């Protein structure tokens, strides 16, 4: 049991195949769920857990990328 938990601590979210956007959304959701009700509105005004990846589509607009690559070099 201890060996297994040490192995989990030594690896990061990238090692588990989680993209930065998924990591950012989970951290934002966690922050919103742990703050007091009176402070939650303040945090929700400045951050929402719905970050998406976008890239220019060539016509001056933005195209949303649904399947985000795990590694930055794959963009």
Swiss-Prot record:
Database matches in SUPFAM superfamilies: Epsilon subunit of mitochondrial F1F0-ATP synthase
A GO molecular function held by the record: proton-transporting ATP synthase activity, rotational mechanism
CC annotations in GO: mitochondrial inner membrane; proton-transporting ATP synthase complex
Topological category with respect to the lipid bilayer: Peripheral membrane protein
One Pfam family this sequence matches: ATP-synt_Eps
Keywords carried by this UniProt record: ATP synthesis, CF(1), Hydrogen ion transport, Ion transport, Membrane, Mitochondrion, Mitochondrion inner membrane, Transit peptide, Transport
Subcellular location: Mitochondrion; Mitochondrion inner membrane
Transit peptide (first-last residue): 1-9
Domain of life: Eukaryota
Similarity comment text for this entry: Belongs to the eukaryotic ATPase epsilon family.
Subunit structure: F-type ATPases have 2 components, F(1) - the catalytic core - and F(o) - the membrane proton channel. F(1) has five subunits: alpha(3), beta(3), gamma(1), delta(1), epsilon(1), plus the additional subunit P18 (Tb427.05.1710) that is not present in F(1)F(o) ATP synthase from metazoa. Subunit P18 (Tb927.5.1710) interacts with the alpha subunit with a 1:1 stoichiometry; the interaction is direct. Subunit gamma is part of the central stalk. F(o) has three main subunits: a, b and c.
Name listed for the protein in its UniProt record: ATP synthase subunit epsilon, mitochondrial
Organism listed in the record: Trypanosoma brucei brucei
